[in-house]
């Protein structure tokens, strides 16, 4: 039809098109992230989270604890006293890097990060944290504290079990943009997916 012809012409002209949530690459990425959140053996269960602190980029590995597909929200846990929390509060434009060395798929994801403040929701996540893992949130010294002679004796001291929840922090990372790169074939495939106001815009890129 004429409409289909015009559609194809527009698509091939600028390789830039608004898509619904049924695009194959988009659906593939959603499946990878969902699997990463609930499958410990997934290559997407851990990722590199980068934030800006004092004009320097700081990167660290974190564990993907949940992925809420409806609002494209990546969740990880941390200690609220950690430097990354301070960085997010000052500048919440962040980036998440995933890579599957077997499937050779890289996801560079630009995010906007927030500290979850809803105590009811925080408690739901806390209840799922294994008892042996909760202890990591109960050190008397904050993460990244320098160990010297003064506080060496406190290095392995912990707060009471009743207080460790106070240091537990849930970080929400809302996806703004995904750079998808597949290196599995001779003709590498790369796409940029922009998510804005619940609309999905896809651009084909040179790998």
Regions found by a protein language model. Give the residues of each.
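Targeting/processing segments of secretory and organellar proteins
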Residues: 15-16
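An N-terminal domain-cap segment
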Residues: 19-71, 75, 86-87
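Charged, gly/pro-rich active-site loop segments
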Residues: 20, 106-207
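Short, surface-exposed beta-edge/turn micro-motifs
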Residues: 44-46, 72, 93-94, 167-170, ...
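Short acidic, glycine-rich loop/turn motifs
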Residues: 51-54, 98-102, 182, 195-197
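A short mixed-secondary-structure module that forms the rim of ligand-binding clefts
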Residues: 65-104
């Amino acid at each position: 039809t004429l409409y289909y012809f015009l559609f194809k012409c527009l698509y091939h002209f600028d390789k830039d098109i608004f898509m619904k949530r049924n695009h194959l690459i988009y659906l593939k990425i959603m499946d990878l992230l969902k699997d990463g959140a609930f499958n410990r053996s997934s290559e997407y269960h851990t990722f590199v989270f980068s934030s800006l602190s004092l004009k320097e980029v700081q990167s660290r590995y974190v564990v993907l604890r949940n992925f809420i597909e409806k609002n494209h929200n990546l969740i990880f846990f941390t200690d609220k006293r950690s430097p990354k929390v301070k960085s997010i509060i000052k500048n919440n434009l962040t980036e998440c890097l995933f890579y599957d060395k077997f499937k050779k798929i890289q996801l560079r994801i630009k995010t906007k990060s927030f500290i979850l403040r809803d105590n009811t929701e925080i408690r739901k996540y806390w209840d799922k944290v294994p008892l042996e893992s909760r202890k990591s949130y109960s050190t008397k010294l904050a993460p990244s504290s320098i160990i010297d002679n003064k506080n060496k004796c406190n290095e392995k001291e912990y707060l009471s079990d009743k207080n460790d929840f106070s240091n537990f922090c849930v970080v929400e990372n809302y996806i703004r943009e995904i750079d998808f790169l597949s290196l599995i074939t001779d003709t590498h495939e790369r796409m940029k997916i922009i998510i804005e106001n619940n609309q999905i815009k896809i651009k084909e890129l040179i790998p």
